[in-house]
Design a protein with these regions (language model features):
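Bacterial N-terminal signal peptides
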Residues: 9-19
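Early exported N-terminus immediately downstream of N-terminal targeting peptides
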Residues: 24-102
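Absolute protein N-terminus
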Residues: 1, 20-24
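Short beta-strand edge/turn micro-motifs at domain boundaries
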Residues: 137-154
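Surface-exposed, charged secondary-structure patches
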Residues: 96-141
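Bacterial N-terminal signal peptides that target proteins for export
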Residues: 1-8
Length: 154
């Protein structure tokens, strides 16, 4: 459950234009949700869905930043070669884990309900994955990194 929250929390560091305001952050999140929902609702193979979900994640998530954040202070002791190798391995792990978890949702119904500007660089967007008979309701907080207005990321 904790990994799910982390994956979803980081899932929306976006690709928007100009300076990102809170309304733009929630629109970005909703847009990303819609892209993923469209893939998950299509009548295509699981493998193709996974491939498409990985593309969405690569477009919207700062996987490298998440990976180094996960390492904590250990990252300071790594050589440049180790950092490059770690980044490659973490990206592969992240994309595989993320897509395999999401692909089981055939028709996710996610509502964006709130947003909060933390700073000029960060906006939190709150959403709710509505529960069904098969899965519980899940709150999802999206941390949007807006330092680069040309390409905000989760």
């Amino acid at each position: 459950m904790k990994i799910r929250k982390i994956i979803f929390t980081f899932f929306i560091y976006l690709i928007c234009s100009s300076k990102l305001y809170s309304i733009e952050a929630d629109v970005f999140v909703q847009s990303t949700i819609n892209r993923a929902s469209e893939v998950l609702s299509e009548d295509i193979s699981k493998e193709i869905k996974i491939k498409e979900l990985k593309k969405i994640a690569k477009d919207t998530v700062d996987i490298k930043r998440i990976g180094f954040y996960t390492l904590g202070p250990i990252r300071k002791n790594l050589t440049d070669d180790q950092k490059i190798r770690y980044s490659e391995l973490f990206e592969e792990y992240f994309l595989t884990s993320f897509s395999n978890r999401l692909v089981v949702y055939s028709n996710p119904n996610i509502d964006v309900y709130d947003k909060k500007i933390l700073s000029e660089k960060f906006v939190i967007v709150n959403s709710l994955l509505k529960g069904t008979e098969e899965r519980p309701e899940v709150k999802i907080d999206w941390r949007i990194y807006t330092k680069n207005p040309e390409k905000p990321l989760i």
